[in-house]
Amino acid sequence: MLRFLNQCSQGRGAWLLMAFTALALELTALWFQHVMLLKPCVLCIYERCALFGVLGAALIGAIAPKTPLRYVAMVIWLYSAFRGVQLTYEHTMLQLYPSPFATCDFMVRFPEWLPLDKWVPQVFVASGDCAERQWDFLGLEMPQWLLGIFIAYLIVAVLVVISQPFKAKKRDLFGR
């Protein structure tokens, strides 16, 4: 399995698949916000940024999968997935155990040199409350679904990093 993951990390297909999944999730978030009129909270915006990190890592990995640039992509992927797990766990706890003493910030805080909320307000402005439950599917709230997604991204990222010392087999996928 590790050789297969190493082989996948050196091809564009797996990186593009990861980019496609992250882009699909971002577009779904925008659908919820602009079509279903759900208000994203501060943690939702940070989770969106972590997902953009996964998307960016996938695009970097797809650019040059056989060069050391893929290691940069793996580091960004690991960091973004880890931060996504942290943020969605915190968001899930705020929704499952609401408290007037534990709340999220009122505004998103981006660095002064990267004011995403001012550059692209349709995507990065928060207007909702983190503890408010706005949507569920099969009994799980949106942060709980994202927690599972980020955990999956993180597990696969760790396995791909572990697989790097193993040499990929020199055959195509059809065994010729």
From Swiss-Prot:
Keyword Transferase belongs to the record: no
Periplasmic-side segments: 32-49, 90-144
Sequence ranges on the Cytoplasmic membrane side: 1-14, 66-71, 164-176
Subcellular location: Cell inner membrane
A cellular-component GO term for this protein: plasma membrane
GO molecular function: electron transfer activity; oxidoreductase activity, acting on a sulfur group of donors, quinone or similar compound as acceptor; protein-disulfide reductase activity; ubiquinone binding
GO biological process: protein folding; response to heat
Keywords annotated in UniProt: Cell inner membrane, Cell membrane, Chaperone, Disulfide bond, Electron transport, Membrane, Oxidoreductase, Redox-active center, Transmembrane, Transmembrane helix, Transport
Disulphide bonds in the chain: 41-44, 104-130
Membrane topology: Multi-pass membrane protein
Effect of gene knockout: Induction of the PhoP/PhoQ two-component regulatory system.
Spans through the membrane: 15-31, 50-65, 72-89, 145-163
SUPFAM superfamilies: DsbB-like
Chief place of localization: membrane
Highest rank taxon of the organism: Bacteria
Keyword DNA repair among record annotations: no
Family named by the database record: Belongs to the DsbB family.
NCBIfam families: PRK01749.1 (NF002485)
Job of this protein: Required for disulfide bond formation in some periplasmic proteins such as PhoA or OmpA. Acts by oxidizing the DsbA protein. PhoP-regulated transcription is redox-sensitive, being activated when the periplasm becomes more reducing (deletion of dsbA/dsbB, treatment with dithiothreitol). MgrB acts between DsbA/DsbB and PhoP/PhoQ in this pathway.
Protein name: Disulfide bond formation protein B
Organism field: Escherichia coli (strain K12)
